From Swiss-Prot:
The lineage of its organism: Archaea, Thermoproteota, Thermoprotei, Thermofilales, Thermofilaceae. One of its GO terms (biological process) is phenylalanyl-tRNA aminoacylation. This is Phenylalanine--tRNA ligase beta subunit. One of its GO terms (molecular function) is magnesium ion binding. GO terms for cellular component: phenylalanine-tRNA ligase complex. Belongs to the phenylalanyl-tRNA synthetase beta subunit family. Type 2 subfamily. It comes from the Archaea. Mg(2+) binds at D323, D329, E332, E333. Tetramer of two alpha and two beta subunits. SUPFAM superfamilies: Class II aaRS and biotin synthetases, Putative DNA-binding domain. It holds the Pfam family B5. It comes from Thermofilum pendens (strain DSM 2475 / Hrk 5). It catalyses: tRNA(Phe) + L-phenylalanine + ATP = L-phenylalanyl-tRNA(Phe) + AMP + diphosphate + H(+). Residues 269-345 form the B5 domain.
Length: 556
């Protein structure tokens, strides 16, 4: 979780309340923040990934005001008249830009540090390392409105942040630290994102760096904020978040009218609305809290709330609250306002007794079956190398799950199949004599963009038989013996696979679909592993075989 550092004295001046270590340690956990350290004026805490509004002192102080009883209800920054328009005609791969002006802020070194911290923490988390969202803050003095978000030539020149000389955008990607770090987000495209003012002066090269000419300093009184994004909803919420945060430092928000990719006013300052049924207090929290108490607690959590009749509450919450997706999230706010420490734990009887996962039960049966067929079980690490899985097996490289900074080249990726590791084991066991019959039941990891975590895990059963005179028949005999024990039928279909001899390899097909492959290992693969006898190997998808087995039981 993001680690945030704030100053106690800064929180005191923003809240208008006296704070000490005890108060901080009491209140921050009620905002789902884990206090790591309070040392003198330094407060260090962890905030959750879904609460970017807690990544700096500005909005943290707003919530502390609610818990301390200083203020309640929605935070209401001053909002003035629109400043004009902003033209949005950026590159297609990063099409959206949102802007806000905040006038009359009062900044010192700590205020600037907090806003920069908020910017970087949002970049790393919600912004997906600037890929999804990037933010810029500028001294508006010297910028002539309206601003434009455009697609620019890589040869366009600017003075990047921290540099005293101008360079082309292409040079920024090569020489500026942020260009080196984030250049991959724009490299390969013919045009780069750029923000310029009405006179054509470069304000920013998002998502890389800002212009040195418009750096925010302690003398800055008017701030221009931009958010560029690949997702319009994400951009809207983050520009609203930053407008609120900067306004906490004493400013007035001035919207801009977007023209181009979107036609709307930015930032959005109006709240979201949801109707909350107070019966959820008991159902989810075990608390008997009526409408009036629920309203009071939600207002303390900096939301507007009022009775809506029939045991319901109309709730309005800040648009930048990206963590609120459902009335269940409002129940969490009620719990936070009430105080987690006041909720007494209760042991809830389980709805059903625990049980072993069916896949584990079935895998154990397969292990016993293979042992009964004369195989010896082995276990390999799930970590392996691409060279073993692909190069040694005569396969083209495919997407795999890799470790970013591996300690050892032999263990830099998660395996996508098990047979290569069995061959490696046989290679190191040549002294043990033949025939050798080994198997392993374990998991593999296959990249799959359709999954939430982009990885599909499969349980596999792999086996190998090595020895003089070993042929495909030996592999088929093992398969038939195993399937006969399960009472499951299968058939073989012609297959092609570079790791096996052509014409001596087959797909194993069941009623539930393809279950795996079996074949005689290709001579070149044997050479790659230093094996001097024929080997037949196979690998099955355990879940497919289990479906057939369970279907047979269901039909019995």
């Amino acid at each position: 979780m993001p680690v945030v550092e704030v100053k106690l004295w800064d929180l005191e001046r923003l809240t208008g309340a006296s704070l000490d270590e005890s108060t901080v340690r009491d209140l921050l956990p009620r905002l789902k923040c884990e206090v790591e350290e309070v040392s003198g004026e330094d407060v260090v805490y962890e905030a959750t990934h879904d609460r970017p509004d807690l990544y700096s002192a500005e909005l943290l102080s707003v919530y502390l005001k609610g818990l301390l009883g200083v203020e309640d209800g929605l935070p209401r920054p001053r909002v003035g008249s629109a400043e004009g328009v902003a033209e949005v005609e950026g590159p297609a791969y990063r099409p959206y830009a949102f802007f806000a002006v905040v006038r009359g802020v009062s900044l010192d070194d700590e205020a600037i540090r907090q806003l920069m911290q908020l910017q970087e923490k949002v970049h790393l988390t919600y912004g997906r390392n600037r890929r999804k969202v990037s933010i810029g803050l500028y001294d508006l003095d010297g910028i002539k409105l309206p601003v434009r978000y455009v697609a620019a030539s890589p040869e366009t020149r600017m003075k990047p942040l921290g540099f005293a000389i101008e360079m082309t955008l292409r040079e920024v990607l090569e020489k500026h630290p942020k260009g080196v770090e984030y250049g991959h987000l724009v490299k390969g495209h013919g045009e780069y994102p750029l923000i310029v003012d009405a006179e054509g002066k470069v304000v920013s090269f998002p998502p890389i760096t800002n212009s040195e000419d418009f750096r925010v300093t302690e003398s800055t009184r008017d701030v221009l904020i931009d958010v560029t994004s690949t997702d319009p909803e994400a951009g809207r919420r983050i520009i609203s978040l930053f407008a609120h945060a900067v306004a906490v430092r004493g400013g007035e928000v001035r919207p801009l009218r977007l023209k181009g990719a979107l036609d709307e006013e930015s930032p959005r300052m109006e709240p979201e609305e949801v109707v909350y049924d107070v019966s959820m207090n008991r159902d989810l929290l075990g608390l008997d809290l009526g409408v009036e108490e629920t309203v009071r607690l939600l207002r303390a959590m900096r939301m507007d709330a009022e009775p809506a009749g029939n045991g319901k509450v109309a709730v309005r919450y800040p648009y930048f609250r990206v963590d609120i997706l459902h009335p269940v999230d409002i129940a969490e706010e009620v719990a936070m306002g009430y105080g987690y420490e006041r909720i007494e734990p209760a042991v809830i009887p389980p709805l059903h007794p625990g049980r072993e996962d069916p896949i584990e039960v079935f895998t154990r049966a397969l292990r016993e079956g293979m042992v009964g067929l004369g195989f010896v079980e082995v276990n390999n690490y799930m970590m392996t190398s691409a060279s073993l899985m692909f190069d040694a097996m005569l396969l083209p490289r495919q997407p795999i799950v890799e470790v970013e900074n591996p300690r050892h080249e032999a263990y830099h990726a998660l395996r996508t199949w098990i047979v290569p590791q069995l061959l490696r084991l046989m290679s190191s066991s040549k002294h043990a004599g033949y025939p050798q019959r080994v198997f392993e039941a374990g998991d593999v990891a296959i990249p799959d963009e359709s999954r939430d975590n982009r990885v599909r895990e499969e349980r596999r059963l792999a086996f190998a038989v090595a020895g003089k005179g070993v042929t495909l028949t030996d592999g088929l005999a093992a398969l038939k013996g195993l399937f006969r024990q399960l009472g499951v039928s299968f058939k073989l279909e012609k297959a092609e696979h570079p790791s096996f001899i052509a014409g001596r390899v087959a797909r194993v097909v069941t009623e539930a679909g393809d279950a795996g492959i079996v074949g005689e290992v290709h001579p070149q693969v044997l050479v790659n592993f230093g094996l001097e006898v024929p080997v037949v190997a196979g690998e099955l998808n355990v879940e497919v075989v289990m479906k057939c087995y369970l279907a047979r039981l269901g039909g019995a």
